[in-house]
């Protein structure tokens, strides 16, 4: 879509609320922007009109560059091509959560709610598909004996993933996490109640993000983040706080692609007898042989089977 860039400003979308988007202009001014009608008509089942993280061109509608409100008004005219998108399935369609990121912070909790490796594995697959770095954070480690987590940490670490145990309550590894986020565009993903908002408040005191409790009846957290939002960090970079995801379904990944996205299964895929082998019940399967020989961790293979059988078949 062609626009007259000479009369437009550039900025980045911080959050989207219904028909209005908060855009931080490159000039440092915060704008409340509507979306040009022609952009809405371009929306398809594969693309949201505007999402947090989008780079946009917009027209300022404030008088002489001075707003009559706390935020200047604007009209978004064009969205730049997206990179590093994270999506999930919503009612059978792609729902883009955030765009233009280079890392995904996958936050789980050791307790309240308990850790769910299958959810971590699904998020890691999504990060690989988006070609962004997955980083695993296990929060609330003050509630358990860290020795109990060592086998799980060992599995992910052996695959080359960074794994960081943290506690927003005690401050454990918060300084390391702050350094890890510096000058990066990072999405936070995890189910409700794992402590995403608490960690952000610890990383950057003064944010004042709302913190929800975990239900003692079902061990599930309450949603405190209701829409994806970009939060600039004082030390450089930004994080995208996304709504808690209880069922993080894979988007646009076929059953035949999953093994190739798992670094521990990938080396054995080409050794199978059948090119379309799914490594479940087929004969002469190199992946199953590697599991039997303990060259592939049995828990990881079980997670692979669960992903295929529960979500992709």
Swiss-Prot record:
Belongs to the TRAFAC class YlqF/YawG GTPase family. RsgA subfamily. Disulfide bonds: none annotated. Binds 1 zinc ion per subunit. Keywords: Cytoplasm, GTP-binding, Hydrolase, Metal-binding, Nucleotide-binding, Ribosome biogenesis, RNA-binding, rRNA-binding, Zinc. Zn(2+) binds at residues 272, 277, 279, 285. It is found in: Cytoplasm. Its main location: cytoplasm. Gene3D superfamilies: Nucleic acid-binding proteins (2.40.50.140), P-loop containing nucleotide triphosphate hydrolases (3.40.50.300), Probable gtpase engc, domain 3 (1.10.40.50). GTP binds at residues 139-142, 190-198. This is Small ribosomal subunit biogenesis GTPase RsgA. Its EC number is 3.6.1.-. GO terms for cellular component: cytoplasm. One of its GO terms (biological process) is ribosomal small subunit biogenesis. It comes from Rhodopirellula baltica (strain DSM 10527 / NCIMB 13988 / SH1). The keyword GTP-binding applies. The gene is rsgA. Pfam families: RsgA_GTPase (PF03193). NCBIfam families: ribosome small subunit-dependent GTPase A. One of several proteins that assist in the late maturation steps of the functional core of the 30S ribosomal subunit. Helps release RbfA from mature subunits. May play a role in the assembly of ribosomal proteins into the subunit. Circularly permuted GTPase that catalyzes slow GTP hydrolysis, GTPase activity is stimulated by the 30S ribosomal subunit. HAMAP family: GTPase_RsgA. Residues 89-248 form the CP-type G domain. Its cofactor is Zn(2+). One of its GO terms (molecular function) is metal ion binding. Monomer. Associates with 30S ribosomal subunit, binds 16S rRNA.
């Amino acid at each position: 879509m062609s626009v007259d860039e000479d009369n437009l400003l550039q900025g980045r979308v911080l959050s989207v609320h219904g028909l209005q988007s908060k855009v931080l202009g490159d000039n440092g001014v915060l704008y409340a922007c509507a979306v040009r009608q022609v952009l809405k008509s371009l929306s398809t089942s594969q693309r949201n009109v505007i999402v947090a993280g989008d780079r946009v061109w917009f027209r300022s509608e404030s008088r002489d560059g001075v707003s009559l409100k706390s935020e200047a008004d604007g009209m978004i005219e064009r969205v730049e091509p997206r990179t590093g998108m994270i999506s999930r399935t919503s009612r059978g369609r792609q729902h883009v959560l955030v765009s233009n990121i280079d890392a995904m912070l996958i936050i789980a909790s050791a307790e309240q709610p308990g850790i769910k490796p299958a959810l971590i594995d699904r998020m890691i697959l999504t990060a690989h598909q988006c070609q962004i770095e997955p980083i695993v954070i296990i929060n609330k480690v003050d509630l358990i004996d860290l020795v109990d987590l060592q086998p799980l940490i060992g599995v992910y670490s052996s695959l080359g993933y960074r794994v960081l145990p943290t506690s927003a309550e005690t401050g454990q590894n918060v300084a390391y996490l702050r350094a890890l986020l510096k000058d990066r565009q990072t999405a936070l993903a995890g189910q409700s109640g794992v402590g995403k908002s608490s960690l952000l408040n610890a990383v950057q005191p003064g944010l004042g993000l709302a913190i929800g409790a975990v239900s003692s009846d079902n061990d599930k957290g309450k949603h405190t983040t209701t829409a994806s939002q970009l939060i600039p960090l004082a030390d450089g970079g930004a994080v995208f706080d996304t709504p808690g995801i209880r069922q993080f379904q894979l988007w646009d990944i076929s059953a035949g692609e999953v093994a190739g996205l798992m670094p521990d299964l990938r080396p054995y895929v080409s050794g199978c007898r059948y090119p379309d082998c799914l490594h479940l019940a087929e004969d002469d399967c190199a992946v199953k042989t590697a599991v039997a020989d303990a060259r592939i961790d049995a828990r990881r293979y079980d997670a692979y089977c669960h992903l295929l059988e529960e979500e992709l078949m």
